[in-house]
């Protein structure tokens, strides 16, 4: 999928770029796999703001995605490749031989009409899902489970990939795109290939209004707030923050401060930490 650039006919268009959606084969989603999404504007069930910079945006419907890939032994055929407003990756509608339809994350290079399957005995082929123990060392994978049967949790966004490096007893060594090397149970499933729509990171929004269409509200600097709103606020004119290090709105150190819980139970599965 290529990136389309615009002529500078206005200030908003000057640096704007969009995906050309060349891979998309239909603009009509499968009705039976849609679910309503109620906008919350970053508020919790008490109406309190818990996530900043959220609100507004175009109305969406959630596409129910098959992250578990547990339909073993039943072949499926890719019917369409579709845009999903809820994620950076595209999705593929799969028609299975028993009549069921499911959405999956669309891997790079998948085509309409291609056959896919899941299970321990599936071929090592793009789009097929197998347990990590059945996938050869060196294979590029995505949509990786952390617990058997829970569904894929890692490497699901546009262009994401991981690679199998080796095996240790009942675990498989997997290198993630962050550079982290992690031990994952060999009974956990993953899908062959890299997630598609890899040019997504090259898209330039171009104007503030396009962020608002996505439901992203403005981010205000702490230094222009009042002191009761932010630790950086207050002072006369363009005052410095007046602290040893930058702070979050709640007074915690930020910008480089480590927030990962110490002695986290999953630390024992991390063989090599991610690149800084």
Swiss-Prot record:
Annotated stretches, region: Disordered: 219-276
InterPro entries membership: NA-bd_OB-fold, Rib_uL2_dom2, Ribosomal_uL2, Ribosomal_uL2_bac/org-type, Ribosomal_uL2_C, Ribosomal_uL2_CS, Ribosomal_uL2_dom3, Ribosomal_uL2_RNA-bd_dom
Alphabetically ordered keywords of this record: Ribonucleoprotein, Ribosomal protein, RNA-binding, rRNA-binding
GO MF assignments: rRNA binding; structural constituent of ribosome; transferase activity
GO terms under cellular component: large ribosomal subunit
GO terms, biological process: cytoplasmic translation
Similarity annotation: Belongs to the universal ribosomal protein uL2 family.
Functional description taken from the UniProt entry: One of the primary rRNA binding proteins. Required for association of the 30S and 50S subunits to form the 70S ribosome, for tRNA binding and peptide bond formation. It has been suggested to have peptidyltransferase activity; this is somewhat controversial. Makes several contacts with the 16S rRNA in the 70S ribosome.
Complex and partners: Part of the 50S ribosomal subunit. Forms a bridge to the 30S subunit in the 70S ribosome.
Name of this protein: Large ribosomal subunit protein uL2
Protein species of origin: Oceanobacillus iheyensis (strain DSM 14371 / CIP 107618 / JCM 11309 / KCTC 3954 / HTE831)
